[in-house]
Amino acid sequence: MPNTTSTYEPLVLVNTADLPEEEWLEYRRRGIGGSDAAAILGVSPFATARDLYYDKLKVVSYEDGESNWVQKKVGHLLEDLVAEIFHVKTGFEIYQVKKMFYHPVYTYMLADIDYFIRLPNGKTAILEIKTTNYNAKDHWWLSLIHI
């Protein structure tokens, strides 16, 4: 049984700063990211576990005919603004590390973190930006647990 009390430093899979989206998707297909958790557990309104499986194998991508592409595009465009608002309202220092990480033991576990927060005590925390409404929280909480 694995030791669940240990902490691990994540390893860098790839620098994502100038990575084209299609290449980013290829790296993402190598493992399971936070966005995949709800589909795996069968609670995602956007994809089933089979959709995800096919996407990972590049058989077919459930993202090809997305009906929610507008929400995703707007959400992506608003991420920096929401992070700035968070910074102004909390006073916490925020910063980005444009890299995709993986777990050193469970190498299939991937993370692409939106922002990091430097807390007043010097510790680092994760800021995952979601531009949605409160009623949709059940659709994204699993991705946060994955991190």
Where would I find each of the regions flagged by the language model?
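Charged, glycine-rich intrinsically disordered N-terminal tails and low-complexity linkers that flank
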Residues: 1-77
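A structural signal for short, well-ordered beta-strand segments and their strand-loop junctions
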Residues: 42, 95-96, 126-128
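Short acidic, glycine/proline-rich loop/turn micro-motifs
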Residues: 65-66, 137-141
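Acidic-basic catalytic patches of nuclease active cores, encompassing PD-(D/E)XK
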Residues: 72-96
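Residues forming well-ordered secondary-structure scaffolds
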Residues: 77, 81, 108-110, 122
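Conserved catalytic cores of phosphodiester-cleaving nucleases, focusing on short active-site segments
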Residues: 86, 113-136
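A short acidic/basic microdomain associated with nuclease active sites
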Residues: 87-107, 114
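Conserved small/polar residues in nucleotide/adenosyl-binding loops
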Residues: 145-147
